[in-house]
Structure formats: C-alpha cells, structure tokens
Curated annotation (Swiss-Prot):
The keyword Transferase applies. GO terms for molecular function: aminomethyltransferase activity; transaminase activity. It comes from Escherichia coli (strain SMS-3-5 / SECEC). The glycine cleavage system is composed of four proteins: P, T, L and H. This is Aminomethyltransferase. The gene is gcvT. It comes from the Bacteria. The glycine cleavage system catalyzes the degradation of glycine.
C-alpha cells in the first residue's frame, strides 16, 4: 500500500486528485494543472515534497567522504548553509541519483535525495560511508513544503517569526538556514524564486493551511513537471539513470574535474567518456500543432550528410510559452533543426539549449 505524507489529509480537503507516485500517494492536481502552473509563474504556489528524503551526515571525516561519494566537490562549500547540486555516480559513471548537499559545519552535512531512488541511495551511501565512520540519520521526522513563484518568499515570510525573517533576509539562492523549527532553503524545482521549507511532521498541516490563507496556491505533480521542464531541470529516470552519463544529461557543469588528484566514484569512467565523446541533452521547440512526448524519436542529418537518431526524454505542452517543448538526448552533430516522428507525421522542430523559461520569462 502506498505511503501517505503528513499532508495527505490537507490534499484531500483541498480537492486533490491523488495518484501513486513511486509508492507515495501524492496530489496530481487540485482541479486545474494549468492554473497551478500559472500561479507559480506569476504569483505563488506550493508543493508537498515530503516524499523526498533528508539525510543528515555527521562525523569528522564527512567532507572527505562526500568528496569521494559525489562528482561535484564539497570543498567548494565553505560558508555555513551553502548548498551544492551534484550527481552521485556508480563506478561506470552512471547516475545513481541527483541530489542537493548542504554544508553546516565540518562534521555536519545534509543531503536531500529523490523519493524514487530512496532505498538504493541509502544503501549506497551507507555502504561507502562505513570506512569513514559517518553517522547517518534519515530525517523521517520532517516534512517538506516547496513554496515557489515571484511572490512566494514574501507570502511565506508572513508565517515566519522575527528571528526567522531575520535569518533569511538577503539569503542568496542555494543556501539553507535552520531558524527555530524551520529549515528554510532558497532552492526549488521550478525556475522561480522561492523556499523549500522542512519542518516537524506534526507542524506541517498547520503550516500548509496558513500558507493557503496567505494566498499560496496548492499545486500538484502535474504542474511540478511542466514547470521543471520549462526550466530545463532533469527528472531522474528520464533525463538520467544508472546507465546514462551526466555528460549526456547536461550535468557536465556539476562534475568537478579539478583538483585532478581528487578520487571520486565514477571519475575514471567519466574521463574516458569525456575523451571519446557522449550523446548530449538538447532542447526542442515545436510551434506547429501537436505535443512532443517522451520516447518519440528525433532524427537529423549532420554536416557530413550522415543520418542520426536520438530520443525525447521529456516532452510537454508549455503553458507559459503556448507551444510544445521537449528535452532530447541526441548524438553529437545536431544542427539547428530536426524531425520528430509523431504517429505517422514527420514534424519539424527547432533545436535549442535545454532550458526554456526562467523567472517567468522565455529564454531566448
């Protein structure tokens, strides 16, 4: 039977259509996915993300451990509360998960990992942490609410006490701070400003209701997916998995190659892939009628006249832009246009960078 987050009852009271999402009963929408999408782009919306897993790591060798575990380098984290996005790779360079790591003190870091990969993530982390003497605490006592949109921070701040408002004042993106019983982070999955707020399970329902009263619109998985796709953000299991290199998933920027003597899991495989070349992730735009969908083939002819085929990893109609967009994994050599096979029709598409909307505006 699927698990329920501490906010399950609030979702049903708000009229949510609930679905099983990787073993969790989660809201798909509360009546209109499109309205929820636009609320985040123009005002403020919120998502229950309590199904994600918060993992606290403690021990004198925690930084050393994470420099080995992750492709990005936590040596970059020197200011308390600073966060970093990274892939956690296997020995062949495939992506076990993508995650966020927060630095608090030399012996205290926090990871936030995906729900779909929870068990394998915890097994992998535990296995590799043992030689470093790391104490691992899974924070199942915490719920998490993502408040996103141009007015999200201001509306959320009406629920904060003076000390909490002071703690987040001027906080830059990709930071987190523990302020009273709230862990408030300037992170998100929508391409908008906002907070991801972790708080004790028993306080989550009251906080959710207070956000509703403050004018924050409840949003479901449907809007979360169209928002993240417009923002060009990867979804685990679609843009990347254990068989796909981060180099083929527009995650090359998350790999810290320097210093050259840092050994991290998957490094040797990645160096070989970098030398020989990999597929790459691109954006696709189709302004003609129709919708680009996952797993549709993408065909193009390179400059030498050779024909190639890639695949759409995520596709949707973009509510913000008013036409269809997609992310696609394709061989090297793609130009400015390609063809997507939709049923029996060959549809022309424009090839773009893999990001379409940021802060409510189209990315040229």
């Amino acid at each position: 039977m699927a698990q329920q987050t501490p906010l399950y009852e609030q979702h049903t009271l708000c009229g949510a259509r609930m679905v099983d999402f990787h073993g969790w009963m989660m809201p798909l929408h509360y009546g209109s996915q499109i309205d929820e999408h636009h609320a985040v782009r123009t005002d403020a919306g919120m998502f229950d993300v309590s199904h994600m897993t918060i993992v606290d790591l403690r021990g004198s060798r925690t930084r050393e451990f994470l420099r080995y575990l992750l492709a990005n380098d936590v040596a970059k984290l020197t200011k308390s509360g600073k966060a970093l996005y990274s892939g956690m790779l296997n020995a062949s360079g495939g992506v076990i998960d993508d995650l966020i790591v927060y630095y608090f003190t030399e012996d205290f870091f926090r990871l936030v990992v995906n729900s779909a990969t929870r068990e394998k993530d915890l097994s992998w982390i535990t296995q590799h942490a043992e030689p470093f003497g790391i104490e691992i605490t899974v924070r199942d006592d915490l719920s998490m609410i993502a408040v996103q949109g141009p007015n999200a921070q201001a509306k959320a701040a009406t629920l904060f006490n003076d000390a909490q408002r002071q703690a987040v004042e001027g906080m830059k993106p990709f930071f987190g701070v523990q302020a009273g019983d709230l862990f408030i982070a300037t992170t998100g999955y929508t391409g908008e400003a906002g907070y991801e707020i972790a708080l004790p399970n028993e306080k989550a329902a009251d906080f959710w209701r207070a956000l509703v009263e403050a004018g924050v619109k409840p949003c479901g998985l449907g809007a979360r997916d169209t928002l993240r796709l417009e923002a060009g953000m990867n979804l685990y299991g679609q843009e990347m998995d254990e068989t796909i290199s981060p180099l083929a998933a527009n995650m090359g920027w998350t790999i810290a190659w320097e210093p050259a003597d840092r050994d991290f899991i998957g490094r040797e495989a990645l160096e070989a892939q970098r030398e020989h070349g990999t597929e790459k992730l691109v954006g696709l735009v189709m302004t003609e009628k129709g919708v680009l969908r996952n797993e549709l083939p993408v065909r193009f002819t390179d400059a030498q006249g050779n024909q190639h085929e890639g695949i759409i990893t995520s596709g949707t109609f973009s509510p913000t832009l008013g036409y269809s967009i997609a992310l696609a994994r394709v061989p090297e050599g793609i130009g400015e246009t390609a063809i997507v096979q939709i049923r029996n029709r060959e549809m022309p598409v424009k090839v773009t960078k893999p990001v379409f909307v940021r802060n409510g505006k189209a990315v040229a």
